[in-house]
Amino acid sequence: MNDVSERLSFFAALYQVDRQPAAGMWLLYGTIFVLAVIVFKLGFAKRLPVLKSAVVYVFLALGCTVLTFLGVFLPVAEGLVVAALILIIYKIRLYQSKKGQSAKS
C-alpha cells in the first residue's frame, strides 16, 4: 500500500501531520503564514493606513488557509522559503548598490 508519510512535503513531514494532525496543521499554517508575510513585506508591501493593512493581512491569512491544505502534499512552504531568500538577497544587493552610489556622490 501507499504510505502517506512518503508523499508529505518537507514541512508537513517535519511537523508530523500524519501522526499529529491537529498540531501539525497549525504549525504548518503558522509557518506558511509567517513566510507569506515575509515575502509580502519584502516584495510587494506599500505603506498603507492601518485599516487597509489589516484588511490585507486578513485576506492573506484566509489565503494561507487554502495554501496550508495544499502544502501538506505540495511544496508550498518550501517555495515560500525560496522566494523569501531570493527577495532577501535582492534587498541586500539593492541596499549595497544604493550605499555605493551615495558614497560616490
Curated annotation (Swiss-Prot):
Q: Which UniProt keywords apply?
A: Cell membrane, Membrane, Transmembrane, Transmembrane helix
Lineage: superkingdom: Bacteria
Q: GO terms for CC? A: plasma membrane
InterPro entries this protein is in? YlaH (IPR025620)
What membrane topology term does the record carry?
Multi-pass membrane protein
Q: Which residues cross the membrane?
A: 25-45, 48-68, 69-89
Location comes to: Cell membrane
Record's protein name: Uncharacterized membrane protein YlaH
> Which species is the source of this protein?
Bacillus subtilis (strain 168)
